């Protein structure tokens, strides 16, 4: 993919950019793999906001992605199309299996129209093939990695993401995640060879707030600019710094770390590097 930059015809256009979408081969999705995606506005079944900063945005249909590929072991599939997916940053590939079934997978880098991919323990080590970590050479770059055998891909699914298999000992393999975290994963877990395509997506400049609204993202307002009724940091004459340790809108201390009592925490070899606190 490439990035197309706009000329500064308006303040919102100045500096903004968009993908050129040259890798896409079809503009309409496979209807049999679509399901409705109702808008929630961040509300739950009682109508209360459970997730802030969500609302509006363009209407979308959810594409059913095959994150497991277990039941297609040994069945070759040809990549029929590379398509756009509004629900994720990565592109998706439509597979036509030899038995006639059609499925979507996340499109790996280097996999295009006409490429043949296959899943299973005996698959070759080439981009797009899916096989257990026990059958993948150490040092290989993979993506769409499972956390538990049979649970479906959970890690390394966004545009440009790659996970490296750095070691294998006993019944566990050690992988390095895009965040820098290193963790152990059962060697029966599956991964797809190669890295996710559309890596240039991170360089897109959205240009104006409205483009985020098209994606269903509402503004994030700081507590210190609110009124006292709306946030513990609100109020005061003129600009204030808050006057207390950072808290959530409900008074809970902010900046908490991960739950150290989580069962899977023992599998984390090295934590991700955290950014500078501001």
Swiss-Prot record:
Region Disordered: start-end pairs: 1-20, 225-278
Domain of life: Bacteria
Protein's UniProt keywords contain Secreted: no
Alphabetized UniProt keyword annotations: Ribonucleoprotein, Ribosomal protein, RNA-binding, rRNA-binding
Annotated Basic residues bias: 258-278
Annotated disulfide bonds: none
Family: Belongs to the universal ribosomal protein uL2 family.
Assembly and oligomerization: Part of the 50S ribosomal subunit. Forms a bridge to the 30S subunit in the 70S ribosome.
Protein name in UniProt: Large ribosomal subunit protein uL2
